[in-house]
Swiss-Prot record:
This is 2,3-bisphosphoglycerate-dependent phosphoglycerate mutase 2. Pfam families: His_Phos_1 (PF00300). The active site is at 13 (tele-phosphohistidine intermediate), 92 (proton donor/acceptor). InterPro entries: His_Pase_superF_clade-1 (IPR013078), His_PPase_superfam (IPR029033), PG/BPGM_mutase_AS (IPR001345), Phosphogly_mut1 (IPR005952). The gene is gpmA2. Keywords: Gluconeogenesis, Glycolysis, Isomerase. It is an enzyme of class 5 (isomerase). It comes from Lactobacillus johnsonii (strain CNCM I-12250 / La1 / NCC 533). The lineage of its organism: Bacteria, Bacillati, Bacillota, Bacilli, Lactobacillales. The keyword Isomerase applies. SMART domains: PGAM. Substrate binds at residues 12-19, 25-26, 65, 92-95, 103, 119-120.
Amino acid sequence: MKRKLAKLVLVRHGESVANRDNVYTGWNDVPLSKKGIAQAKNAGLKVEKIAEFAPTHIHTSVLSRAIMTANIIADVCSFLYLPITKTWRLNERHYGALRGINKDVSKKIFGTNQVLEWRRGFDSVPPLLTQPVQDRRYQKYDMRLMPQGESLHQTQERLMPYFWDHIAPELMAGHDQLVVAHGSSLRALIKKIEDISNEDIVKVEVPNAEPIVYTFDTDLHIVKKEILH
């Protein structure tokens, strides 16, 4: 019997209150806005209509906005019975000392070109926090692993071990997977699986709550990609 081609569906969380207020978030934990809740429900309706999509596992971060979105999608799609893994490795890129700052204000403080480089340069690291992350959700981990600010490259490096260990084997076995994460963490993943150059990743945007559907063969080659606007 021929093994089915597996689908990987990536969804960025719905609008958060920080997105609404144009504030850098990173590892700050913020909920969805009312608009974000509606977007998550709509994303669920889109995921529900994906032909022959039957995920065996849901993967998300340990941040509320992604978890809320994953739960809403699971509810809409009747996926609540599925196992869900919440991992810090799928967290948003850590924006260091920029987190909590309004994006327009950051341009006035640091200059537009510098901020653009921090946001879009693959290896550009924002100003670091002066203290490690103090949050109970990370207490069980080796604090030396916890970033105080990250480039997109560093985000990719801490994310990909989880992908190779927990998602890729399932896809290669023909099992569909659903990942609900964040704009920059998903950009880092997309860069790797699509083999996008450092220069071209600057142009890649991942909008809130618009599912991206990849179909893979058993060697993890992309057969088809579709964005559900």
